Amino acid sequence: MDFKYDVIVIGAGHAGCEAAAAAANLGSKTCLITMDMNKIGQMSCNPAVGGIAKGQIVREIDALGGQMGLVTDETAIQFRILNRSKGPAMWSPRAQCDRAKFIWSWREKLENTPNLHIWQDTVCELLVENGEVVGLVTLWGVTFKAKCIVLTAGTFLNGLMHVGRHQLPGGRMAEPASYQLTESIARHGIAYGRMKTGTPVRIDARSIHFDLMDTQDGECDFHKFSFMNTSTRHLKQLQCWTCYTNEEVHRILREGLPDSPLFNGQIQSIGPRYCPSIETKIVTFPDKEQHQLFLEPEGETTQELYLNGFSSSLPMDIQIAALKKVPAFKDIVIYRPGYAIEYDYFDPTQLKHSLESKIIKNLFFAGQVNGTTGYEEAGGQGLIAGINAHINCHGGEAFTLARDEAYIGVLIDDLVTKGVDEPYRMFTSRAEYRILLRMDDADMRLTERAYHLGLAREDRYQLMKTKKEALEQIVNFAKNYSMKPALINDALEKLGTTPLRQGCKLIEILNRPQITIENIAEHVPAFQRELEKATAADSDRKEEILEAAEILIKYQGYIDRERMIAEKLARLESIKIKGKFDYASIQSLSTEARQKLVKIDPETIAQASRIPGVSPSDINVLLVLSGR
């Protein structure tokens, strides 16, 4: 057996799976090393993919030729679009998945990917020669050689779990931690730190009084994650349930705080701000009388339920006693308690936008080891790292995404430019070009780039082109078709909008909030015929195309304005400054700016402007020095 590869990926979580699939599908001889082949793509916390901004990332992964969207659609047991009451820039898909089927779907895809081999083992050392990674050594004493390595070790690096005052080494419940690897990397000058995350109890459904909870149903419309017309949701669609904590629950939780590792000094690491434990909630918001809980199924047939909103590392008896004070949980039986876990991460400002280390050539980092939290954030990073590892092996320009191209671009730019001091989670508010980064048009933004790269296949590219042509046909018809008051006013009144006083173009009527493409098409036969003609080549995705067309029509002004702003700022992206200045010697820069610029060494003026502590006056100094 030959232990020489183009690309080796360490860790088979969400980042590792995407990285390995991308590198192999692009043609690199790839090896994915995992501690347990039965946990490939494991959903370590909640059994769900997507959510606010995260759903857009999954759509982008799919548009680029990644796998997460396909796996999610195949294993979804409930699907919803979040933020429906807001504009389309905020719409975010989310799916509950069957946890076990999710793992096997990923494994099936990876095992049947050409150029990809899977090896079960634990990596304990990287081999570095002259500042370049050349291989690794495993606990079994196997030496691998590689042109590039992608580290996606998740929470396993020196992982330590906590339940009350009990501590147990591990990367996940009942799974061993990975030792020696952090130290092997750090000795080459790469800085690292510690972070913390947590997960809630898992509950036996047979012990729950569901009649005392509210139900939360999914949506059974055309929406899904993948843009491919072969992707379907075929599993049984299930309910979720909601309920609330109360003062009695909070009283018991407060009594347990002296034994809470978060409050007794046992855990020093920082946890995710936007996914706090239940004990953090009651301390931070002491006046809040209740907190909402979501009970989510772990699979199509299992009795195991996930209690979203009750992450905890309190002693197990406190967790159970508190939950018993919720009426629906009065007879609760759990499979395992909630727990917290501390783990190592590496400072992401030591990375290029390609996710390659600035310190060790051909070593890439992706996922939770970069200080992020979330399957989707990990998957997006893994995809980019896998692509660029392949490019480093075979030559070519690094593949990066700009902030106006993708949420993945925002994510990576934030990491490498600003760094992290707590687990990073993506939100729509982090993106300044939200209307350009909608969930409906990720294929329009990214598939062509992925096609020319070689990752998006011909069938995906043709689907994108067909959709693009249909959108152009519908929008152009609406711009040019004239409407006469006598022919449309009765319909407008029925639809609850003001009648026309004079003729206008159809697009002006479609801009009204009460009007949709489908309800006006019922009254305009020529438009109905045009819609049928435009979507004839892709009738399976007709609803998706009509939704995208309506968004383009109603929000075109906002889209154009945001694109114009992005293009203006793009001029600063074209001014390259990496390696041009000795920042420490430029006295006209502020002290903080000098320190930050030396540390980050930004690629462009635009990136420099996004570094915290670098002021507009500092940017003006750099512009003058650049001859601008």
From Swiss-Prot:
Question: Which positions bind NAD(+)?
Answer: 271-285
Which Gene3D superfamilies does this one have? FAD/NAD(P)-binding domain, GidA associated domain, C-terminal subdomain, tRNA uridine 5-carboxymethylaminomethyl modification enzyme MnmG/GidA
- Note the InterPro entries from the entry: FAD/NAD-bd_sf (IPR036188), GIDA_C_N (IPR049312), MnmG (IPR004416), MnmG-rel (IPR002218), MnmG-rel_CS (IPR020595), MnmG_C (IPR026904), MnmG_C_subdom (IPR047001), MnmG_C_subdom_sf (IPR044920)
* Record keywords, A-Z: Cytoplasm, FAD, Flavoprotein, NAD, tRNA processing
One cellular-component annotation, GO: cytosol
PROSITE patterns found in the cross-reference section = GIDA_1, GIDA_2
Q: Give the residues the record marks as binding FAD.
A: G11, A12, G13, H14, A15, G16, V123, S178, Q368
> Which GO biological process entries does UniProt record here?
tRNA methylation; tRNA wobble uridine modification
Cell location: Cytoplasm
Q: Which Pfam families match?
A: GIDA, GIDA_C_1st, SAM_GIDA_C
GO molecular function, a single term: flavin adenine dinucleotide binding
Q: What does this protein do?
A: NAD-binding protein involved in the addition of a carboxymethylaminomethyl (cmnm) group at the wobble position (U34) of certain tRNAs, forming tRNA-cmnm(5)s(2)U34.
Q: How does it assemble?
A: Homodimer. Heterotetramer of two MnmE and two MnmG subunits.
Q: Would you tell me the protein name for this molecule?
A: tRNA uridine 5-carboxymethylaminomethyl modification enzyme MnmG
Q: Which gene encodes it?
A: mnmG
